[in-house]
Amino acid sequence: MSNPLVNWWRSHNFNEAVKSQNNRVAKQLLKEIENSGAKLSWQQKLFKERLQLEKLLQKKNDRIKEADRHLEELERQLSFGQLDDSLGRIDELTLFPDTKFIEHISKSFKLRDCDESMIQCTGIDEKIFNNFEQHLAGFIKNELNKLNREKNNVDDLLKQAVDDIQKLKEGQDPQYSFELSPHIYLMRYFLDNVYCTYLAWFLIYKAGLLPTKVNILDIAAGPGTVAYGLGLLLQSSSDFFSMPPMHISYYSLEQQKAFQYRGLQFWRQYMEPQAMNAYFRFDTSSIFDRENQSKRLPKKFFDFIVISHCFFNDEERREKSLQIYKDIFTSSLNDYGYALLIIQEKKLLIPYNVRRVDDCQHELSVVRQFIDELGLNLVWYKYLNSIGSRTSPPNFGKFARENLPVKEFISPLFRQHFKLPYDIHYGVDDYVILAKKR
């Protein structure tokens, strides 16, 4: 039998199994269809999503039963005048994915599954991001105005920081050490990176993996991009369900103290009034200072260790950093924790002498090779991409103007300080990789 005929026969039998509510047979046939590489029909996709939701519901029920068991044990101990750490474990539940909220985010960001791994994203939650961007632009303007009153060489300082950060366009690693580097970063790359981490946390939430009590280590944290992405996602959910008590412990590991300071300064102005229950701890040191870090970083403590865009172009620094990351995952990630890696397409592919991947299997082999270097096991990955293609359009500027949300409040600052005659748009071209330690 030819493959099309085999696929048709499997699909026919699958439909019959679903109609007769024979879930065991339907599951087996769905697995065979997926393994064959055939594209899933809408009914098969719907059935698969139903299975995933049932699995999440069962997981939630199991956690509730476990919490009830801990509560009974705690009550028993209290009756005997005893108390252990059971109380701390009762609240370790995950946020259960809300269907309407997931639909809202998918629609707002115009998320489209292009293939097994690539998701096109051309939209935004305007209510959340417009307000956030407007406040950010105001924050940057106020800081620069304050500096203009205090110093006579602000233009020179701005040029230093702009020239440094523009090295990214040339495939080099910026120093980020100039006085106004934080301001220029906030102006140029902060919103895109928050946009990406927002979507990364959304994928984790959608998979039912986001705890209500979460300990996060953010390596090379910058101004706290990872915390902002999570904070805005939780803010987005307020119209859809009642948020259970959340507790976010955020550990920022960052070499540049000025980035940490500016990030915390803006957080206090914008995020804290949103009643965000977040505790910050700052470790101002280089990732290459591993000996001292190993003494400070808690052991087997973190639910998520995140590395967002801190992967080097320089080969020697890249190899050294990957070994350090591997050591940190081994020592500081708890037994049930996850590594969340966000890396640009070029920085993932080029070290393996790959310029472009044209199929998912080739892409998967590169991702697995990368994960293996970090001593991790892959859980899943997604390639978030604004253009919906693995090849760039001949005129990306035209595509952006016609399809991507503009940064309405930051663009005037960008035009002024980068001396470029066009607006900038929200966009993403990153791999979001979730992994666990071995």
Regions found by a protein language model. Give the residues of each.
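Generic helix N-cap/helix-start motif at coil->alpha-helix transitions
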Residues: 2-12, 23-24, 39-48
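Conserved small-residue packing positions in alpha-helical repeats and bundles
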Residues: 13-17, 49-55
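Domain-level detector for long C-terminal conserved domains
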Residues: 19, 25, 29-38, 59-101, ...
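N-terminal auxiliary segments of SAM/dcSAM-dependent transferases
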Residues: 81-167
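Conserved class I S-adenosyl-L-methionine
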Residues: 212-222
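Conserved SAM-binding motif I beta-strand of class I
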Residues: 249-254
